[in-house]
Curated annotation (Swiss-Prot):
This is Suppressor of silencing P0. The keyword Cell division does not apply. GO terms for biological process: symbiont-mediated suppression of host innate immune response; viral process. InterPro entries: Virus_P0 (IPR006755). It comes from Beet western yellows virus (isolate GB1) (BWYV). Belongs to the polerovirus P0 protein family. Keywords: Host-virus interaction, Inhibition of host innate immune response by virus, Suppressor of RNA silencing, Viral immunoevasion. The keyword Nucleotide-binding does not apply. Residues 63-67 form the F-box-like domain. It holds the Pfam family Luteo_PO. Suppressor of RNA-mediated gene silencing, also known as post-transcriptional gene silencing (PTGS), a mechanism of plant viral defense that limits the accumulation of viral RNAs. The P0 protein suppresses local PTGS using its F-box-like domain to mediate destabilization and degradation of the AGO1 protein.
Amino acid sequence: MQFVAHDNFHTLEVRKVRYLHSRQVTFLLAGLLLNIEQFVKAIKERNNEFKIDIFLRSLLYQLPLHLGDHVHDDVRKSLLVPEPELCAWFSLQTGYAPASTSGRVNLYVPGTKTSRRRIIQRSLASNFSEKFKRFPECLFVGFEHFQRFLSIWTRDAERRLFSGCREIPVGSHTLVELANLGELLRVMVASEQFHNSRLLSRLAVHCYKIYGEDGFIS
């Protein structure tokens, strides 16, 4: 597993050169996070024009997709499926939109925020229609009640789409929390305690500090 910083795009690329067990993947990612400050320092020494904020956003965008299943299950499973709406959520919150991707997992999202919001809107509307099928009685309680029901759903969708998709800030605090997360993941791998409630609570706290209070990723 290789971690490559691209000078042209100021981004991080994670290359998987061979099959690795899920614990190995988590252990290597933990090592990157644990040493992220040194990694960033080495990049800046090599290329002073390198934009670290973009690099960090590209890392934050990819991290949940690489870690998703591995953190919650010590049996080899497929990666968290990067469905379009999931990638759109991640992209809006991290402020990063990859134009292309390498490997078998496609992380591409449209470049504009409007396009990404439309993906999420379609997903929310699809979920609404599926749930609506289970409660058809909403159609038979009168127009006023249905209108009120639809208004509540619309306000909730708008709140999730705009208030819940604020772009998170990145900076020195991000490096500190990523290192803390890496240290915790190392402990979880070494002790094989992926289901320990205390450690999972600590993991949630680190995600909260990295991705924010309203973070969909958290």
